[in-house]
Amino acid sequence: MTTNTYDVGDVVMAAKALRNDGTYPDPAISIGEILVEAGTRGQVINVGLYLQEHIVYAIAFENGRIVGALERELEAAEDAEDATQAEPAATPTAAAAAEGSAPAAVLVAEKVPAEPAAHGAGGHAAKTCKHGSANCKSAAADAEPAVPSTPAEPAKAATPAKPATPAKPAPPAKPAGKTVGAGTPGAKDGRR
């Protein structure tokens, strides 16, 4: 089993520029665009697995983006003194959350830019969804005005079907001969 090098709360740096591989949720950022420059500091907020063998870290970087990164794309901060200065602005809140005054979910919400509340909330006028697709069915449904539905005409009464003709009954089985038991030929000693 693989073990993770970094734990939640550790301060790390991007070892190389991290680019959008198509999984970053902001449609304004195109595939291949740099999300995080090399050397940018961030804090590990989640540790998970990809394909059950690759450890992936969710990192809240200083530029406000939360990006998933593999272990080989990260490196430890140079020294602990710089790491304490480079922690995100929500660190005092993290200490308060540890004491029970604020839930941990609030910490993440303070660092993450707000997402649109509804599907397609960012582009009703252009009829595109938040993913940037112009032909998204849900975006078209969001953009269409609500029209009161008119009741459909009642369906015509169906004509009665012809009664099914019953199949001819099978003739009764004819005994092949007297038998004593199932499949046993008749007795040969004169009994009937």
Swiss-Prot record:
One of its GO terms (biological process) is nitrogen fixation. Keywords: Nitrogen fixation. Residues 85-102, 150-165 have a biased composition (Low complexity). Residues 77-102, 117-192 are annotated as: Disordered. Pfam families: NifZ. The keyword Ribonucleoprotein does not apply. Coiled coil: none annotated. InterPro entries: Nitrogenase_MoFe_mat_NifZ (IPR007415). Belongs to the NifZ family. This is Protein NifZ. It comes from Frankia alni. The lineage of its organism: Bacteria, Bacillati, Actinomycetota, Actinomycetes, Frankiales. The gene is nifZ.
